[in-house]
Each structure stands twice: as C-alpha cells, then as structure tokens.
C-alpha cells in the first residue's frame, strides 16, 4: 500500500509535485493539502490550468473540504485544510508519513519540526535550508539515513549544478569555480516596481528587466560535495521568461583536458550513473525546448567554451519547475524506501 503523504503550500512546486505523482500513478498517496491562503475552488482552478505546463489532462473539482481528481480512470480524493500554524495541521489524524513542505515559510529545522508536532513523521523541505541536511538526487541522496526526519531537496539551481559539478570534479578536479544562473521569473518577484527589503533590485518589474540577484545554489553544492567548500560560489540574473533556466559554470581544472574530453565525460555520466538526472545535448537548443524536461540538468555541448585545457565555461539547462518537482518526488520515494 502506498505511503500517505501531505503537501503544505499549494504554490508552483506544491502543485507540480502533485502533477508528477499523478503522472507516475501516485506511487505515494497524497491524502491532505494544506494552504491557508486559497479556497478549495481556487485550488482546483490553478491546478487545472497552468500557463507554462498546460492544462491538467484529467479532471479536478473543488468540493467541501477536498479536491476530487480523476486521471486515467482513477479517482483521488484529497482532503484540504487551511491552517497557518503547521502544528495545527491534522497530519496525524490523516496518518501522513511525509510532509512535502513547499510553502517556502518553514525551511529551518525548528520550523519544520512544527509539522511533526501536527503528527507528521518526516518533513521534506522543497527549498535550501540553513540547518537541515540537504540532498541532491543522483549526487548524495544515498547518504540520507532512515532516522533523518527533516531534510531538504536543496534548490532547483543546486539540482542542476551539482550533477555537472560532480562529474567534472570527479574526473578532472575543480581548483575553483564561479557559477551564474540565468533564471526565469519566480513568484517572489514583482510585476511592477516596488519595495523589496534590503535587496532593492529584487523589487524591480520582472517583465521589464534583467535583475542581478544573489543565490545560495553554489554554496549549497558545497554542502552536498564538501570537498569543494571555499572553492565555488555564484550569482543569479533573473530574466523575463516564465520558465526554464540555465547554469554557466566557469571553472579552473586540476587535470588539463580538452573540451571534447570534458564533453565525453559528461556524456558518459549522462548515459551511466547519472542517467535520468543529467542529460546531454549537442543540438542547437534554446530555453523553451526544455519546458517539461524531467531531468535536473541537461549539458549543452554546443554552448560551452574553453580558453585552454584548464579554464572552461560549461553550460547546462534545467526546467526549474518540472525538473525540480521530479527530484522532489524521487527523493520522497527514496526516503520512503529506507527502514
């Protein structure tokens, strides 16, 4: 019998994680969704219609206290609650084993533990965490232990960068590196200019600007590949596209290699131990070609360049929504397999 799972926060990632689970035949059974800021009818609407990923292929109806979803002849009744305090969400009453914490509001160990006060056994945070252990599927997920009850899937950018970084570091060694992600618009940005805390540029209109921004993705990679600590950092440019982002990793290598040798190493990993996580393309692709791409990172052999045999710029694409949501599900299922 499939494990019982809950979702807290029915935003971009919460909804897409549910879509991924449904597309896979619901290998973990979502029994409760909590979101205090949206009605059940509105939940059904934003789940059914998606500007980026298209209309849901089944039916979804908002009823009193639940969503009724039908897909491929299967009917799924999912209870809905609207608690602001995670400790008050009826996870225990619903026998929820793992909560997918996708609200973005409870990303520390202390805050995530509130879900456990509500009766959940484990919490999977769908964002980087300041103190919870972080795992990138395909890179270090095998180190997740059964007794780790709060853990993070890191960020979409970390999930793109880490597999590529692992291949390059394992094969050639990275002396130091700088990462830039050219990142699509996200929900935290503004449609028109407005105030934005200390990072004033983040408050500028998303559709009309390229916005330099900070990112913890490179630092998070050093949490999953500790030997790179102090040797890798990065930044972000937010750009006015709806979805799909791209990582530029500029690195100094320990072992000299031609660009062709680097491409061969990545292709070998993409067809081997990182198959399904890391992809490889040598075609003339652009960002929209990767909408709906389930892999974490697709290396673009045509886009990268080498200055010499020890200084290279490598490029890898990712669907920052769908690819990341697939890894959330993979890490969820892996955690449920541990005893």
Swiss-Prot record:
GO MF annotation list: glyceraldehyde-3-phosphate dehydrogenase (NAD+) (phosphorylating) activity; NAD binding; NADP binding
Compartment(s) of residence: Cytoplasm
E.C. numbers: 1.2.1.12
InterPro entries with a match to the protein in the record: GlycerAld/Erythrose_P_DH (IPR020831), GlycerAld_3-P_DH_AS (IPR020830), GlycerAld_3-P_DH_cat (IPR020829), GlycerAld_3-P_DH_NAD(P)-bd (IPR020828), Glyceraldehyde-3-P_DH_1 (IPR006424), NAD(P)-bd_dom_sf (IPR036291)
This protein's record includes keyword Isomerase: no
Record carries keyword Oxidoreductase: yes
Pathway: Carbohydrate degradation; glycolysis; pyruvate from D-glyceraldehyde 3-phosphate: step 1/5
Entry's family note: Belongs to the glyceraldehyde-3-phosphate dehydrogenase family.
Keywords, alphabetical: Cytoplasm, Glycolysis, NAD, Oxidoreductase
GO biological process: glucose metabolic process; glycolytic process
Binding site for D-glyceraldehyde 3-phosphate: 155-157, 186, 215-216, 238
Annotated site residues (Activates thiol group during catalysis) in this chain: 183
Main localization (coarse): cytoplasm
Chain ranges passing through the membrane: none
Active site: 156
Domain of life: Eukaryota
Listed CDD domains: GAPDH_I_C (cd18126), GAPDH_I_N (cd05214)
Quaternary structure note: Homotetramer.
Protein's name according to its UniProt entry: Glyceraldehyde-3-phosphate dehydrogenase
Binding site for NAD(+): 12-13, 35, 84, 320
Pfam family, one: Gp_dh_C
């Amino acid at each position: 019998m499939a494990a019982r799972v809950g979702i807290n926060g029915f935003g971009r990632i919460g909804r897409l994680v549910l879509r991924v689970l449904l597309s896979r035949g619901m290998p973990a059974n979502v029994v409760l969704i909590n979101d205090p800021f949206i009605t059940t009818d509105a939940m059904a609407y934003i789940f059914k219609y998606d500007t980026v990923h298209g209309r849901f292929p089944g039916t979804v109806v908002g009823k009193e206290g639940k969503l009724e979803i039908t897909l491929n002849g299967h009917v799924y009744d999912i209870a809905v609650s609207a608690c602001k305090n995670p400790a008050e969400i009826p996870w225990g009453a619903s026998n929820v084993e793992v909560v997918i914490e996708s609200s973005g509001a409870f990303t520390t160990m202390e805050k995530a533990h509130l879900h456990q006060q509500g009766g959940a056994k484990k919490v999977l945070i769908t964002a980087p965490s300041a103190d919870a252990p972080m795992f990138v599927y395909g890179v270090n997920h095998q180190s997740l232990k059964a007794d780790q009850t709060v853990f993070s899937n890191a960020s979409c950018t970390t999930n793109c960068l880490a597999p590529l970084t692992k291949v390059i570091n394992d094969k050639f060694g990275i002396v130091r590196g700088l990462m830039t992600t050219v990142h699509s618009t996200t929900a935290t940005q503004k449609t028109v200019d407005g105030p934005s805390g200390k990072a004033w540029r983040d408050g500028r209109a998303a559709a009309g600007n390229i916005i330099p921004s900070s990112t913890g993705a490179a630092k998070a990679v050093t949490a999953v590949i500790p030997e790179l600590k102090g040797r890798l950092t990065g930044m972000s440019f937010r750009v006015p596209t709806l979805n799909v982002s791209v990582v530029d990793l500029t690195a100094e290598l320990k072992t000299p290699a031609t660009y062709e040798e680097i491409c061969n190493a990545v292709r070998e990993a993409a067809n081997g131990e990182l198959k399904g996580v890391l992809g490889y393309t040598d075609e003339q692709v652009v960002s929209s070609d990767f909408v709906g791409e389930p892999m974490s990172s697709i290396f673009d052999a045509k886009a990268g360049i080498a200055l010499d045999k020890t200084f290279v710029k490598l490029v890898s694409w990712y669907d920052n929504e769908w690819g990341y949501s697939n890894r959330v599900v993979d890490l969820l299922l892996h955690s449920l397999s541990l005893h």
